[in-house]
Amino acid sequence: MRAIAALLLLTAPACALDCKLPAKEMARTELLFGAGTVSESAWHQFLSREVTPRFPDGLTALEGYGQWKADGGTIAKERARVLLIWHSPDEKTDAALDAIRGAYKKQFHQQSVMRVDGEDCVSF
Protein backbone atom coordinates (compact mmCIF):
# COMPACT_ATOMS: atom_id res chain seq x y z
CA MET A 1 0.00 0.00 0.00
CA ARG A 2 2.81 2.42 0.86
CA ALA A 3 4.46 1.72 -2.49
CA ILE A 4 1.25 2.58 -4.34
CA ALA A 5 0.83 5.81 -2.37
CA ALA A 6 4.44 6.77 -3.09
CA LEU A 7 3.99 6.02 -6.79
CA LEU A 8 0.86 8.16 -6.93
CA LEU A 9 2.72 11.06 -5.32
CA LEU A 10 5.57 10.74 -7.82
CA THR A 11 3.27 10.67 -10.84
CA ALA A 12 0.88 13.41 -9.71
CA PRO A 13 1.25 16.64 -11.69
CA ALA A 14 2.89 19.53 -9.88
CA CYS A 15 0.55 22.33 -8.87
CA ALA A 16 1.08 25.34 -11.09
CA LEU A 17 1.03 28.79 -9.55
CA ASP A 18 -1.83 31.07 -10.51
CA CYS A 19 0.14 34.27 -11.13
CA LYS A 20 -1.89 37.41 -11.68
CA LEU A 21 -0.64 39.70 -14.45
CA PRO A 22 1.80 41.37 -14.64
CA ALA A 23 3.46 38.78 -12.39
CA LYS A 24 5.13 35.79 -13.96
CA GLU A 25 6.14 32.45 -12.49
CA MET A 26 9.82 32.15 -11.64
CA ALA A 27 11.95 29.67 -9.75
CA ARG A 28 13.44 30.87 -6.45
CA THR A 29 16.58 29.48 -4.90
CA GLU A 30 17.79 30.31 -1.41
CA LEU A 31 21.42 29.55 -0.63
CA LEU A 32 22.33 29.58 3.07
CA PHE A 33 26.01 30.07 3.92
CA GLY A 34 27.71 29.67 7.27
CA ALA A 35 29.58 32.91 7.92
CA GLY A 36 31.39 32.20 11.18
CA THR A 37 34.89 33.40 10.23
CA VAL A 38 34.14 34.95 6.83
CA SER A 39 34.86 38.70 6.86
CA GLU A 40 32.60 41.25 5.21
CA SER A 41 35.34 41.98 2.68
CA ALA A 42 35.83 38.29 1.82
CA TRP A 43 32.06 37.86 1.41
CA HIS A 44 31.81 40.82 -0.98
CA GLN A 45 34.78 39.53 -2.98
CA PHE A 46 33.09 36.13 -3.19
CA LEU A 47 29.87 37.74 -4.43
CA SER A 48 31.77 39.75 -7.04
CA ARG A 49 33.85 36.83 -8.27
CA GLU A 50 31.51 33.82 -8.00
CA VAL A 51 27.89 34.98 -7.83
CA THR A 52 27.41 38.19 -9.82
CA PRO A 53 28.98 36.84 -13.05
CA ARG A 54 26.58 33.88 -12.92
CA PHE A 55 23.51 35.95 -11.98
CA PRO A 56 24.04 39.45 -13.38
CA ASP A 57 20.28 40.17 -13.48
CA GLY A 58 20.21 40.51 -9.71
CA LEU A 59 19.88 38.84 -6.34
CA THR A 60 19.21 39.67 -2.72
CA ALA A 61 21.78 39.08 0.03
CA LEU A 62 20.70 38.95 3.67
CA GLU A 63 22.57 38.65 6.97
CA GLY A 64 21.28 36.17 9.49
CA TYR A 65 21.96 33.74 12.30
CA GLY A 66 21.80 29.98 12.15
CA GLN A 67 21.99 27.04 14.47
CA TRP A 68 21.85 23.26 14.14
CA LYS A 69 22.45 20.13 16.14
CA ALA A 70 26.08 19.14 15.63
CA ASP A 71 27.64 15.71 16.05
CA GLY A 72 27.47 14.77 19.71
CA GLY A 73 24.17 16.60 20.22
CA THR A 74 25.52 20.07 20.98
CA ILE A 75 23.87 23.08 19.39
CA ALA A 76 26.23 24.86 17.00
CA LYS A 77 25.53 28.56 16.36
CA GLU A 78 27.01 31.02 13.88
CA ARG A 79 26.36 34.05 11.74
CA ALA A 80 24.84 33.21 8.37
CA ARG A 81 24.32 34.79 4.99
CA VAL A 82 21.42 34.06 2.67
CA LEU A 83 21.22 34.65 -1.08
CA LEU A 84 17.80 34.84 -2.72
CA ILE A 85 17.94 34.37 -6.48
CA TRP A 86 14.93 34.33 -8.82
CA HIS A 87 15.61 32.65 -12.14
CA SER A 88 14.40 30.42 -14.96
CA PRO A 89 14.60 26.75 -13.99
CA ASP A 90 17.07 25.01 -16.29
CA GLU A 91 20.19 22.85 -16.23
CA LYS A 92 22.55 25.79 -16.82
CA THR A 93 21.15 27.59 -13.78
CA ASP A 94 21.38 24.43 -11.65
CA ALA A 95 25.04 24.07 -12.64
CA ALA A 96 25.71 27.73 -11.76
CA LEU A 97 24.08 27.34 -8.34
CA ASP A 98 26.05 24.17 -7.62
CA ALA A 99 29.28 25.90 -8.73
CA ILE A 100 28.61 28.73 -6.25
CA ARG A 101 28.02 26.22 -3.45
CA GLY A 102 31.17 24.31 -4.32
CA ALA A 103 33.31 27.44 -4.53
CA TYR A 104 32.11 28.66 -1.12
CA LYS A 105 32.72 25.30 0.55
CA LYS A 106 36.21 25.12 -0.91
CA GLN A 107 37.25 28.74 -0.27
CA PHE A 108 35.88 28.99 3.26
CA HIS A 109 36.32 25.34 4.35
CA GLN A 110 32.61 24.71 4.92
CA GLN A 111 30.96 21.28 5.09
CA SER A 112 27.84 22.42 3.27
CA VAL A 113 25.83 25.24 1.76
CA MET A 114 22.10 24.67 2.14
CA ARG A 115 19.94 25.04 -0.99
CA VAL A 116 16.17 25.56 -0.89
CA ASP A 117 14.14 25.74 -4.11
CA GLY A 118 10.62 26.99 -4.69
CA GLU A 119 8.40 28.88 -7.11
CA ASP A 120 7.02 32.39 -6.82
CA CYS A 121 4.89 34.85 -8.73
CA VAL A 122 7.19 37.79 -9.48
CA SER A 123 6.48 41.28 -10.79
CA PHE A 124 8.47 44.50 -10.83
Q: Predicted regions: what is each one?
A:
Residues 17-20, 47-48, 70-72, 100-103:
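Intrinsically disordered, low-complexity boundary segments flanking structured domains
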